[in-house]
Regions:
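N-terminal beta1-alpha1 cap of cysteine-dependent amidohydrolase-like domains
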Residues: 1-126, 162-164, 228-236, 267-307
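Cysteine-nucleophile active-site neighborhood
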Residues: 105-180, 184
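Structural motif
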Residues: 97-101, 132, 260
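Glycine-rich beta-alpha junction loops
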Residues: 53-55, 194-196, 263-265
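A glycine-centered loop/beta-turn motif at secondary-structure junctions
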Residues: 243-281
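Conserved beta-strand scaffold positions in the cores of enzyme catalytic domains, especially
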Residues: 51, 82-84, 158, 189-191, ...
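Pocket-forming structural segment of enzyme catalytic cores
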Residues: 149-250
């Protein structure tokens, strides 16, 4: 893939100030406007976004992350397309960036089995291709995850994490102070998960929770060997600390960024979307895109979380 370098230039105005980062009605935002994994790349410069298993890992609208990436590329003059990868497909290793969404227990098990049997995503990760994983997608990428019935499933081993149930489900607005270089603004999303994800030594947190729960605390810490990793680096708080300021959110390891934030998270956080695009394009920066509706959405969601 040879990317166009649009890292220099003035602010790009979105057509009509489209709301939610291009997720409004229109041909460019249609979730049906995708291509099959075995289709040919239209040109060498076309950016291919791999939408991984939306048939089972698309419960919470996380498919929208691929739409955001495509639209932000198109606004900057790049040709981009979404490659829809289902359970009926071999997973290609040729996409320039991948997104994986959330799902329930049965869907997670199907996803883990298929991605293990068809390891194109693993090959892409080994080459440093950027991947965004949401909620259950994050759990599948780990060493193992426990379902609500207590059964343990093996993950892909791409992230040094384990996931087991919390005492109660985490539902609500989530605001996170990012700890990843390149992110300077608070991250906002909506969490809806039963799992508590614990980081091992090779994984780092995406950020520190300001409002909400984040990665959570296992109901049975003894089932998770690294339970102390539920606190942010430098905190003295114990695993079960009540202060949300001591909690961490998400996982960063290699080229993978994972989070419990739905929304879709990239629609709410354009800086996050552009960080992923810079990695996919191999550039240091991109010209800003002015979407006033997104800034309004961010203000509203962050204010809601603080109430």
């Amino acid at each position: 893939m040879t990317a166009q370098d649009t890292s220099a230039g003035s602010t790009v105005s979105s057509p009509g100030g489209a709301p939610a980062d291009g997720l409004s009605a229109g041909a460019d935002a249609s979730p049906l406007d995708t291509v099959a994994p075995d289709s040919r790349r239209p040109s060498e410069s076309t950016i291919r976004i791999g939408l991984v298993l939306p048939d089972v890992m698309g419960t919470y609208g996380d498919d929208g992350n691929s739409l955001v990436l495509r639209q932000r590329l198109r606004w900057r003059g790049h040709d981009a397309e979404i490659v829809r990868i289902t359970l009926d497909d071999e997973v290609p290793d040729s996409c320039d960036i991948y997104t994986v969404g959330g799902g329930e227990d049965a869907a997670q098990k199907l996803a883990a089995r298929h991605l293990s049997d068809s390891p194109g995503l693993q090959r892409a990760v080994s080459r440093g291709v950027p991947v965004l994983a949401i909620c259950a997608g994050m759990q599948v990428f780990g060493e193992w995850f426990l379902a609500s019935d207590g059964s343990r499933s093996r993950g892909l081993g791409l992230l040094d994490i384990t996931t087991s149930p919390q005492a109660s489900r985490s539902i609500g607005e989530l605001v996170v102070e990012p700890q990843l270089a390149g992110l300077t603004q608070p991250l906002t999303g909506f969490e809806n998960h039963m799992g508590a994800t614990v980081l091992g030594a090779d994984a780092a947190a995406l950020g520190r929770v300001l409002h909400g729960v984040g990665n959570g605390v296992p109901a049975d810490p003894s089932a998770t060997p690294n339970a102390a990793s539920t606190t942010a680096p430098g905190d003295s708080a114990s695993t079960g600390a009540s202060s949300t300021g001591s909690r961490i959110e998400g996982v960063v390891q290699g080229s993978i960024i994972a989070t419990y934030m739905h929304g879709p998270v990239l629609a709410r956080n354009p800086e996050f979307a552009d960080l992923l695009l810079c990695r996919a394009l191999g550039v240091d920066s991109l010209p800003p895109v002015d979407v006033p509706a997104v800034e309004q959405l961010r203000r509203e969601r962050i204010a809601t979380a603080r109430r």
